[in-house]
Every structure is written in structure tokens, then in C-alpha cells.
UniProtKB/Swiss-Prot annotation:
It holds the Pfam family Nitroreductase. It comes from the Bacteria. GO terms for molecular function: oxidoreductase activity. Belongs to the flavin oxidoreductase frp family. It is an enzyme of class 1 (oxidoreductase). It comes from Staphylococcus saprophyticus subsp. saprophyticus (strain ATCC 15305 / DSM 20229 / NCIMB 8711 / NCTC 7292 / S-41). Its cofactor is FMN. NCBIfam families: PRK10765.1 (NF008033). The lineage of its organism: Bacteria, Bacillati, Bacillota, Bacilli, Bacillales. Reduces FMN, organic nitro compounds and disulfide DTNB. Involved in maintenance of the cellular redox state and the disulfide stress response. Its EC number is 1.6.-.-. This is NADPH-dependent oxidoreductase. Keywords: Flavoprotein, FMN, NADP, Oxidoreductase.
Length: 251
């Protein structure tokens, strides 16, 4: 096993402070090509990548996201579920393909395809010495993002990725993940609630200790509390409507 690859993946953490130095076109091409070689369901390649270095477009997307690093980075990617090219094939084909890419299964396939591509790009970027952070916040206003990026029907902006050279004072670190035993199930799912609660209790303490050590005791939030606060907030409740408008979840 390559210790380099293992350690690279284990040491991943989100970077939100970047130097102003742009990423070269040669590196962007390498990143995209590495992404393209991710696995793709049934060879559909149901994704596109929008690369953004235009400051005005970044500013417009920042208004949607609310995050400064949408502008302050070396480069910005937006990952798009894309069946537009498939719809063009459908227009010229004797087969009726539309049900497939307008179905819930089509949504899952396109989302998974785009995510695998993005993770290949993320790992490659980190191997090049760049830092990165995902931007789910672009879904705060899907309609506006579609307008800014001029996305046609049968496409959907899933998330973004800001990347670049980390600032010298960037001091992020990997957050503790759930224990191996809690996420890995041998042969069958272990749904024993007592066991799950016991593991979560220990993990909550680990996360609380992590935050405390990072903030000199100012933050001691547990993982369970963080999850409860986030998932009880009513956010992006228009997502099904936006998917329908884009031509998805019709079946």
C-alpha cells in the first residue's frame, strides 16, 4: 500500500484562506483530467464542470453563498449534474431516453457521477499542494446560480469547490471522524440502538475535546448537538421545486 496516498487522504481538511495567486491553466487541465477518470455509472458521464476565474462571476456567486472564499481563492469550480448532452442525443435517437434522466434514479446517477469527479479533483489538488473547500452554499439560491452560469434545462448546480495555495497562517486540521466500528458493518447493518448510543456518546466527547483544544475552551459543542442544530433548521426547502424546474424528478 502507498503510505503517501493513505496519508494524503487521512490528512484532508477544508481550507478557507487562500493566497491570491491564481492556479495555472496547465494545473486546471490536469485537475479536470484527473476528475474525468473517476468511475461513471454505465459510462453516462452525467456531469459538467464550470471553471470560474472571472472576478465578476465570483462576486455574483459570493452573493448566493455568503462566503468570502468564493471570491478569495486561486480558482473556483462548480460541479453540475448534466443530462443536457443526453437530451440532445435523445432528440436524434429512435429511443425514448427522457424518462431515464428525468427519474429519481437519473438524479442519483448524475449526483454520484459529479461527486466522484469532484473527489478525484480534490485529492489531486491536495497532492499538488493546494487546499480546497466544498461549497454546498451555492444551493442557497439555485435559480440565481442557474441564471449566472446560463445553465440549460436538464442541468443542475450541485456544489462548488474553491481551491488555491493555503495562506501561511492557515492552521486547519482534520476533524475527528466517526469511529471505524460505527460506520463499517460486517455483512449486515448493526441497528442495535444501545450500541449506537454508546458509540455516539464516546464520539461526542472526542469532538467536544477537539473543539475545546482548538478554541482554548471557547467551544465545546458535541457532534450530536451540532447535527441537531443543523438538521432542525429549515433550509433550502425549495429544492424539489428547483429540481422539477430543471427537468428532474418527473418520474
Amino acid at each position: 500500500m502507498s503510505e503517501h496516498v493513505y496519508n494524503l487522504l487521512k490528512n484532508h481538511h477544508s481550507v478557507r484562506k487562500f493566497k491570491k495567486e491564481p492556479i495555472s491553466e496547465a494545473h486546471i487541465k490536469q485537475l479536470v483530467e484527473a476528475g474525468q477518470n473517476a468511475s461513471t455509472s454505465s459510462y453516462l458521464q452525467a456531469y459538467s464542470i464550470i471553471g470560474i476565474n472571472d472576478p465578476e462571476i465570483k462576486e455574483e456567486l459570493k452573493e448566493v453563498s455568503g462566503q468570502p472564499y468564493v471570491v478569495e481563492n486561486g480558482y473556483l469550480f462548480v460541479f453540475v449534474m448534466d443530462y443536457y448532452r443526453h437530451s440532445i442525443i435523445n432528440e436524434e435517437s429512435k429511443h425514448d431516453m427522457q424518462t431515464s434522466f428525468e427519474s429519481a434514479e437519473g438524479l442519483l446517477v448524475g449526483t454520484i457521477d459529479a461527486t466522484l469527479v469532484a473527489q478525484n479533483i480534490a485529492a489531486t489538488a491536495e497532492d499538488m499542494g493546494y487546499g480546497m473547500v466544498y461549497l454546498g452554499s451555492l444551493r442557497n439560491d439555485v435559480e440565481r446560480v442557474r441564471e449566472i452560469l446560463e445553465l440549460p434545462k436538464h442541468t443542475f448546480p450541485l456544489f462548488g469547490m474553491a481551491l488555491g495555495i493555503p495562506e501561511d497562517d492557515e492552521n486547519g486540521s482534520p476533524k475527528p471522524r466517526l469511529p471505524f466500528e460505527h460506520v463499517f458493518h460486517a455483512n449486515k447493518y448493526d441497528s442495535d440502538k444501545d450500541s449506537q448510543r454508546e458509540t455516539l456518546k464516546a464520539y461526542d466527547q472526542t469532538v467536544s475535546d477537539y473543539y475545546s483544544s482548538r478554541t482554548n475552551g471557547e467551544r465545546t459543542e458535541s457532534w450530536s448537538n451540532q447535527v441537531a442544530n443543523f438538521m432542525s433548521a429549515k433550509q433550502r426547502l425549495d429544492m424539489l421545486e428547483q429540481l422539477n424546474k430543471s427537468g428532474f424528478i418527473k418520474k
